[in-house]
Amino acid sequence: MKRFAVLVLMVVVALFCTGMGDLGGQPEGTIPETDVRIEAKVVDRTGVETSLNQFSMDGKTYLDALRGSGQLTIPFQQLATLSLGKATGDEMAVQVKLKSGVVMDLAIRKRAVFYGSTGYGAFVIKARDVARIDFP
Protein backbone atom coordinates (compact mmCIF):
# COMPACT_ATOMS: atom_id res chain seq x y z
CA MET A 1 0.00 0.00 0.00
CA LYS A 2 2.87 2.36 0.80
CA ARG A 3 4.37 1.80 -2.68
CA PHE A 4 1.02 2.59 -4.29
CA ALA A 5 0.76 5.88 -2.37
CA VAL A 6 4.31 6.83 -3.42
CA LEU A 7 3.51 5.98 -7.05
CA VAL A 8 0.34 8.11 -6.99
CA LEU A 9 2.25 10.99 -5.40
CA MET A 10 4.98 10.75 -8.07
CA VAL A 11 2.40 10.80 -10.87
CA VAL A 12 0.68 13.86 -9.38
CA VAL A 13 4.01 15.69 -8.96
CA ALA A 14 4.99 14.79 -12.53
CA LEU A 15 1.71 16.21 -13.86
CA PHE A 16 2.23 19.47 -11.99
CA CYS A 17 5.83 19.75 -13.18
CA THR A 18 4.92 19.25 -16.84
CA GLY A 19 2.20 21.90 -16.57
CA MET A 20 4.52 24.64 -15.32
CA GLY A 21 5.77 25.73 -18.75
CA ASP A 22 4.29 28.58 -20.77
CA LEU A 23 1.64 28.13 -23.43
CA GLY A 24 3.92 28.92 -26.37
CA GLY A 25 3.37 31.87 -28.67
CA GLN A 26 5.79 34.68 -29.36
CA PRO A 27 8.69 35.05 -26.93
CA GLU A 28 8.62 38.31 -24.99
CA GLY A 29 10.22 41.20 -26.85
CA THR A 30 9.81 39.75 -30.35
CA ILE A 31 7.43 40.35 -33.23
CA PRO A 32 6.16 37.90 -35.83
CA GLU A 33 8.40 37.62 -38.88
CA THR A 34 6.72 38.60 -42.15
CA ASP A 35 7.68 38.21 -45.80
CA VAL A 36 6.75 41.81 -46.61
CA ARG A 37 8.22 44.89 -44.91
CA ILE A 38 5.33 47.20 -44.01
CA GLU A 39 5.83 50.65 -42.47
CA ALA A 40 3.08 52.23 -40.39
CA LYS A 41 2.47 54.99 -37.87
CA VAL A 42 0.19 53.93 -35.01
CA VAL A 43 -1.63 56.54 -32.93
CA ASP A 44 -3.07 55.17 -29.69
CA ARG A 45 -6.15 56.47 -27.88
CA THR A 46 -4.00 58.80 -25.73
CA GLY A 47 -2.55 60.47 -28.85
CA VAL A 48 0.92 58.89 -28.68
CA GLU A 49 2.36 58.26 -32.17
CA THR A 50 4.72 55.35 -32.82
CA SER A 51 6.47 54.78 -36.15
CA LEU A 52 6.91 51.10 -36.97
CA ASN A 53 8.38 48.81 -39.57
CA GLN A 54 7.70 45.08 -39.95
CA PHE A 55 4.08 45.97 -39.13
CA SER A 56 1.52 43.17 -38.95
CA MET A 57 -1.96 42.36 -37.67
CA ASP A 58 -1.91 39.09 -35.74
CA GLY A 59 1.29 38.26 -37.66
CA LYS A 60 -0.32 38.88 -41.08
CA THR A 61 0.45 41.65 -43.57
CA TYR A 62 -3.14 42.32 -44.51
CA LEU A 63 -6.22 43.77 -42.85
CA ASP A 64 -8.58 40.98 -41.84
CA ALA A 65 -12.01 42.64 -41.65
CA LEU A 66 -15.74 42.08 -41.91
CA ARG A 67 -17.80 43.79 -44.59
CA GLY A 68 -21.39 43.13 -43.63
CA SER A 69 -21.65 39.38 -43.22
CA GLY A 70 -18.62 38.71 -45.44
CA GLN A 71 -14.91 38.44 -44.72
CA LEU A 72 -12.60 40.92 -46.49
CA THR A 73 -8.79 40.89 -46.60
CA ILE A 74 -6.89 43.93 -47.88
CA PRO A 75 -3.08 43.95 -48.15
CA PHE A 76 -1.55 46.74 -46.07
CA GLN A 77 0.25 48.01 -49.20
CA GLN A 78 -3.15 49.20 -50.51
CA LEU A 79 -4.12 51.08 -47.33
CA ALA A 80 -3.63 54.78 -46.61
CA THR A 81 -5.37 55.09 -43.22
CA LEU A 82 -7.32 53.03 -40.70
CA SER A 83 -9.46 54.97 -38.23
CA LEU A 84 -10.72 52.75 -35.43
CA GLY A 85 -14.02 53.56 -33.77
CA LYS A 86 -15.95 52.15 -30.85
CA ALA A 87 -16.21 48.51 -29.91
CA THR A 88 -19.56 46.74 -29.94
CA GLY A 89 -19.42 43.21 -28.61
CA ASP A 90 -16.37 41.45 -30.03
CA GLU A 91 -16.00 43.84 -32.99
CA MET A 92 -14.73 47.36 -33.61
CA ALA A 93 -15.84 49.74 -36.31
CA VAL A 94 -13.00 50.78 -38.62
CA GLN A 95 -13.04 53.32 -41.43
CA VAL A 96 -10.60 52.28 -44.14
CA LYS A 97 -9.14 54.68 -46.68
CA LEU A 98 -7.33 53.02 -49.56
CA LYS A 99 -4.44 54.67 -51.40
CA SER A 100 -6.78 54.80 -54.42
CA GLY A 101 -9.02 57.17 -52.42
CA VAL A 102 -11.85 54.69 -51.81
CA VAL A 103 -13.29 54.90 -48.28
CA MET A 104 -15.29 52.09 -46.67
CA ASP A 105 -16.67 51.20 -43.27
CA LEU A 106 -15.67 47.76 -42.00
CA ALA A 107 -15.29 45.95 -38.68
CA ILE A 108 -12.40 44.07 -37.08
CA ARG A 109 -12.08 41.88 -34.00
CA LYS A 110 -11.38 44.08 -30.98
CA ARG A 111 -8.95 41.43 -29.68
CA ALA A 112 -6.79 41.73 -32.80
CA VAL A 113 -3.18 42.60 -32.03
CA PHE A 114 -0.86 44.82 -34.08
CA TYR A 115 2.89 44.21 -34.02
CA GLY A 116 5.87 46.19 -35.27
CA SER A 117 9.48 47.11 -34.69
CA THR A 118 10.40 50.60 -33.56
CA GLY A 119 14.06 50.14 -34.45
CA TYR A 120 14.91 50.10 -30.74
CA GLY A 121 12.47 47.39 -29.63
CA ALA A 122 9.32 45.40 -30.28
CA PHE A 123 5.94 47.15 -30.18
CA VAL A 124 2.63 45.38 -29.48
CA ILE A 125 -0.80 47.00 -29.16
CA LYS A 126 -4.35 45.66 -29.05
CA ALA A 127 -6.83 46.98 -31.60
CA ARG A 128 -9.09 48.38 -28.87
CA ASP A 129 -6.24 50.71 -27.81
CA VAL A 130 -5.61 52.10 -31.32
CA ALA A 131 -7.18 55.31 -32.64
CA ARG A 132 -5.54 55.47 -36.09
CA ILE A 133 -2.96 53.77 -38.27
CA ASP A 134 -1.33 55.61 -41.18
CA PHE A 135 0.53 53.82 -43.97
CA PRO A 136 3.07 56.10 -45.73
Where are these regions (language model features)?
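Bacterial N-terminal signal peptides that target proteins for export
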Residues: M1-L9
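Bacterial N-terminal signal peptides
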Residues: V8-F16
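Compositionally biased alpha-helical segments
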Residues: G21-P136
